[in-house]
């Protein structure tokens, strides 16, 4: 399945919530009607079946983290093998992706931009260049911007925007040095309450 390259706001309207695919401090509900379907005169969304709700939740989370279907299913399988709550394990695995950590630290304005920074070899983990967006970051790993990439305007702009947002408690960032520490794996209470991971577990358990 190919990665979606179309309008980002359309995806958020389809899911009925801000997927954080656009940069900026304001939520996008001020720009578009999230309760309506995509399109200039989008009708209100029909009531979904139980399966429809489960599928929609999976699509929403997959799009938030920018993960393709096969990869997302693999994350679920890994989450199911781990001890504890499968849904919570799934979200924690997604949060440890390098592209997501780069975004959480504010080096990229969006996860898509952060993924690009990783792919273009602008990111280092513990002093070594890593260009795999799905690379798993561990607690206490240090993530930094490569020296030759520190003059990029988009990184500076992203850090300025990030300075206006509430910073995640599980990362520690030194904006001047353009580096941060991944202090710990986030708890479920740290993450968005708008995600209902149990629906995803129910979908894949069928």
From Swiss-Prot:
Keywords: Ribonucleoprotein, Ribosomal protein, RNA-binding, rRNA-binding. GO terms for cellular component: small ribosomal subunit. GO terms for molecular function: rRNA binding; structural constituent of ribosome. Pfam families: Ribosomal_S4, S4. Residues 96-156 form the S4 RNA-binding domain. It comes from the Bacteria. InterPro entries: Ribosomal_uS4, Ribosomal_uS4_bac-type, Ribosomal_uS4_CS, Ribosomal_uS4_N, S4_RNA-bd, S4_RNA-bd_sf. GO terms for biological process: ribosomal small subunit biogenesis; translation. Part of the 30S ribosomal subunit. Contacts protein S5. The interaction surface between S4 and S5 is involved in control of translational fidelity. One of the primary rRNA binding proteins, it binds directly to 16S rRNA where it nucleates assembly of the body of the 30S subunit. With S5 and S12 plays an important role in translational accuracy. Belongs to the universal ribosomal protein uS4 family. This is Small ribosomal subunit protein uS4. It comes from Shewanella sp. (strain ANA-3). The gene is rpsD.
């Amino acid at each position: 399945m190919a990665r979606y390259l179309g309008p980002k706001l359309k995806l958020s309207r389809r899911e009925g919530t801000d997927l954080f695919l656009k940069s900026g401090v304001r939520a996008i509900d001020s720009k578009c009607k999230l309760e309506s379907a995509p399109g200039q005169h989008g009708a209100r969304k029909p009531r979904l079946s139980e399966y429809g709700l489960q599928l929609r939740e999976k699509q929403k989370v997959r799009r938030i983290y920018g993960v393709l279907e096969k990869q997302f299913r693999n994350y679920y399988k890994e989450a199911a093998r781990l001890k504890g709550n499968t849904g919570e394990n799934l979200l924690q695995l997604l949060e440890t992706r390098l592209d997501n950590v780069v975004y959480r630290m504010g080096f990229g304005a969006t996860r898509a931009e952060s993924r690009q920074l990783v792919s273009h070899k602008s990111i280092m983990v513990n002093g070594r260049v890593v260009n795999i967006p799905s690379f798993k970051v561990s607690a206490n790993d240090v993530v930094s911007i490569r020296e030759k990439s520190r003059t990029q305007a988009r990184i500076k702009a992203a850090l300025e925007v990030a300075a206006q947002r509430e910073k995640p408690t599980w990362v520690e960032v030194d904006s001047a040095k353009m580096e941060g520490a991944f202090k710990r794996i986030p708890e479920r209470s740290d993450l968005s309450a708008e995600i209902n991971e149990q629906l995803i577990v129910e979908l894949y358990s069928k």
